[in-house]
Design a protein with these regions (language model features):
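Flexible loop/turn segments at secondary-structure boundaries
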Residues: 16, 215-216, 228-230, 280-283, ...
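Gram-positive cell-envelope targeting signals
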Residues: 1-24
Length: 470
């Protein structure tokens, strides 16, 4: 088209489109969009305070006892309080008494537990890595799990094996294997006590503040336990505290109904210990010739009187555990992370404290505080912090919360631990899988817990007074 023909044509187009009509953008109707879901970062902070909010001591609503009196279960509003008299019979009798009392509960323990075990197995072995190792054949999956259970149980001290056998005797009727039929077989009951060693799905964290940073002058320790809560948060129906009463070797475990190993516990000398999964960058899971580290934690708490002794006990045995993990350990005067590394690819077993040099990629400026996540942190260890979102972001969130020199009261400590709104895309510390937030207060010698209920993780949960632990 020649120029003299193009100009009039362009003018005509502009006239038709309104470009020369004198209308402005104000004359145009605004397009309709859905309301934005973006929120300012400040909306992800809770802005609450626990000042003047005491822990709640729940009353017993009902009690259930074994016929021999070895086990008593007190049902509270939000958890079960279990007492096992370890002097009331042999180990087999203790396990059997616990199971006998559990069968009396209105929560249908056997069905609830089996459902949870199979949900967890399906979740863990649904990943691409697991499928590459075991394939998609259900029979192969249960065969693998049974092999792990048998191997780890066989390596336990006799008294723990006898407890497990006594426990299973009340459910199995002699049945073995894995069949989802509403009844716990021997193998299914044994798996219950070995879940972390066999299935390994955790994302936990913790921090401790020594007396120089607290108003009371005594240590405060917090441990967050996270797990797959199951369908409709079914696992929360089994929130539980177990008191293993055995004179000077007594231990308290904060756990789920039925478990006899220890994932989080404290003894009557004030030693607190909690297991956190780590894993390996190079090595696949192999329990051949290995033993359970959650039962090793129980044994350490039953025999050790200081945090250092407990940590050294565990690091000496690290090569005998099936996979890498941390154990967060405190007493009134000291705090450690036992970095239980069992393979040369990922480092060495060691005790980390506040003065231990850290990985070059880590920053920490919270004096007199020791933090732990699902990775080793000591200099020279394999780096599973960098590039692992839930580890590095949690570490950084703790650093920011506890940096500076503010002296913390128990109430302020609780406020900091719940400073994030729960369950958002920006939540780093209290994820949707939080089972409980547990605090050991070395001023009052008490444990306080905020248990997650069926409704999920609360922004400002009630802390329950679980009583004196030493």
């Amino acid at each position: 088209m020649k120029r003299k023909q193009f100009v009039p044509a362009l003018a005509a187009v502009m006239l038709l489109t309104g470009c020369m009509s004198g209308r402005t953008y104000e004359d145009l109707p605004a397009p309709a969009y859905e309301k934005s879901t973006l929120q300012p970062v400040g909306d992800y902070s809770t802005h609450h305070s626990y000042e003047g909010v005491p822990a709640v001591r729940e009353e017993t609503l009902a009690s259930y006892r074994s016929k021999d009196g070895i086990c008593r279960i007190d049902a509270k509003a939000h958890y079960y309080d279990v007492t096992l008299d370890m002097t009331g019979g042999d180990a087999y009798a203790v396990g059997a008494a616990y199971a006998e009392a559990l069968k009396q509960l209105p929560v249908q323990f056997e069905q609830m537990t089996e459902d949870y075990l199979y949900d967890t197995m399906n979740t863990v072995y649904r990943s691409a890595d697991s499928l590459a190792v075991i394939g998609s054949d259900p029979a192969h999956k249960t065969e693998l799990i049974a092999g792990r259970v048998h191997t780890l149980k066989a390596a336990l001290p006799a008294r723990y094996r006898q407890e497990m056998d006594g426990f299973a005797s009340q459910f199995s009727g002699g049945d073995t294997g894995f069949v989802q039929d509403g009844r716990l077989s021997q193998d299914e009951a044994d798996l219950l006590h070995l879940i972390p060693d066999v299935l390994r799905e955790t994302a936990c964290s913790g921090i401790t503040v020594n007396g120089s940073r607290t108003v009371s002058g005594k240590r405060l320790t917090a441990r967050l336990m996270e797990w797959d809560l199951g369908r409709e948060n079914a696992m929360t129906a089994g929130n539980c505290v177990v008191h293993f009463r055995n004179g000077d070797h007594s231990v308290t475990s904060v756990t789920s109904l039925g478990l006899l190993d220890i994932i989080t516990g404290a003894n009557d000398d004030g030693v607190f210990a909690a297991v956190l999964d780590v894993g390996s960058r190079e090595e696949l899971y192999d329990c051949t010739g290995k033993t359970s580290y959650t039962y090793a934690v129980r044994e350490a708490l039953e025999t050790c009187t200081t945090a250092r002794e407990c940590g050294e006990y565990l690091t000496r045995r690290a090569s005998g555990f099936p996979y890498n993990h941390n154990v967060f350990i405190t007493d009134e005067n000291s705090a450690f992370v036992a970095e239980d590394c069992h393979t040369e690819y990922d480092g060495v077993p060691l005790l980390r404290d506040e003065s231990t040099p850290l990985l070059d990629t880590l920053e920490w400026d919270a004096p007199d505080c020791l933090c732990v996540v699902n990775a080793f942190a000591a200099k020279g260890q394999g780096d599973q912090m960098t590039g692992t979102k839930h580890n590095i972001l949690r570490w950084e969130k703790y650093r920011r919360l506890f940096s500076g020199t503010e002296k913390l009261s128990l109430e302020r400590f609780k406020t900091l631990m719940t400073a994030e709104k729960a369950g958002t895309e920006f939540t780093e510390i209290r994820g949707n899988g939080l089972v409980f937030l547990l605090i050991a207060d070395y001023d009052t010698h008490t444990l306080q817990a905020a248990f997650t209920g069926r409704e999920g993780v609360a922004d400002m949960p009630d802390f329950l007074d679980l009583g004196v632990f030493y």
